[in-house]
Amino acid sequence: MVATYYVGTCSWTDRTLIEEGSFYPPSLKNSAERLSFYAQNFNTVEVDSSFYAFPAERNAHLWVERTPTSFLFNIKSFSLFTFHKTPLSALPYFLKEELPENLQKRSHLYSSQVPKQWLKMALDAFLSAISPLQEEDKLGYILFQFPPWIEKSREAMEYLSWMRENIKGTIAVEFRHNSWLSEENRGEVFRFLRKEKLSYTCVDEPQLPWTVPPIVEATTPELITRFHGRNKSAWEKKGAPVEEKFAYLYKEEELNRWKETVNKKSPDVERIFLMFNNCFRDYAIVNAQQMKLFVGE
């Protein structure tokens, strides 16, 4: 078995990429035109905006229409579903109306504060919004990126099991607290992910006391790696802008080492996703294009 490679970036609408002007022709004036052009160059993309607000089902239909049949969208989970602080204003109106009255007056919510029945309703609404992608076999994975303060715990693992019960398709899980991947815990974590059919997501990022190591492992037929860059000084700087944190252009030899690593896993999986999140200017585009050449896509 030879795996299919999916190589792309974690946004096609990044402001600094558009301003850079080196990838998109200047004649392209909107997101729709840029998506069509992007899909001529790559076979997958990650949607980051879904972390901040529910995607519109109409947009999902349009994404299907504007991309080739084999093109895959990967959707980043809405913030509330991954233990992040979520503005009440980010919720669709009908969901706000269904909240208990005392919660409707808050400015922000955490998932731990809402009734489980309401959380299930919110999850179903989110899944309904992206259902056109699933119906047309254009949904790669839904990414659940935990925040750095969520340590390995029984409660967090039970929550992932609950998500698995309620979501069809590929769920990618990215841990950002190193307790999940410590030498003591990683074996148990990988066994749990395999049992629940959850896709572990490897990350390449600066190696600091609080970050996670780049351990390559497949817990489902998908091998997923996200490249955050290695801008160590920016990650160490308190309050560094997001753009600065991801301002890192991988060297060819760094990408080549990754190619060799994932190629060894190719016989054991069906799909390999290599997603570049170093979204600053055209860095992610350049590195994704290089990786495409390296893996023969």
Regions found by a protein language model. Name each.
Residues M1-E297:
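Residues lining hydrophobic/aromatic ligand-binding pockets adjacent to catalytic sites
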